Amino acid sequence: RLTDKIGDTYIAPMDTNRMNYYNSTLVEGKSVAIGYLGNLGSPLQSKIFSERKEERDFIFADAYDYYLTTPTNANFFDTKIPYSNLMYTTMGGSTQKEEQLKGTLTSNFGKKVNVGADLDYIYGRGYYNSNGTKLLSYRLFGNYISDRYQMYAYLANSNFVNFENGGI
């Protein structure tokens, strides 16, 4: 990750056993108090006002802040061997099933160049009529790190489809 102001890197040692890993997949694990429509991938907002980010120019994207990749939450890697992480979670019965497929693949080419890709696919059938969600986000990223120069870049795209039932 990069810092907000000048883009310095946060150094984080990779750990093979993440603590409270199951909380990273649940909506409730993103904050102490979250308001949302009940299924994975639906718009959400923190009920704690100080946790909310500054509003965007396109206000409808604010409810998807937890799903969007921004320069402040994009991860970059510097690995000695190729790294991959694949996660598949499923919740609920057949009529209300929620699924998430999330993956990262990255590899260094030489000592200075790293290239990788992220994928996040969420599909929720919904608990109510016309309450389904389908979110697809992907990102191609790379970085160049030498003694004198550092460059970080990524290209990301998100496609969110939510069915609306007019309120619960």
Which sequence ranges carry the predicted segments?
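Transmembrane beta-strands of outer-membrane beta-barrel proteins
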Residues: 84, 115, 149-153
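Acidic, small-polar-rich N-terminal luminal/periplasmic segments of exported/outer-membrane proteins
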Residues: 1-80
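Transmembrane beta-barrel strands of outer-membrane/channel proteins
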Residues: 86-90, 119-121, 153-157
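Transmembrane beta-barrel architecture of outer-membrane proteins
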Residues: 15-18, 28-33, 99, 121-123, ...
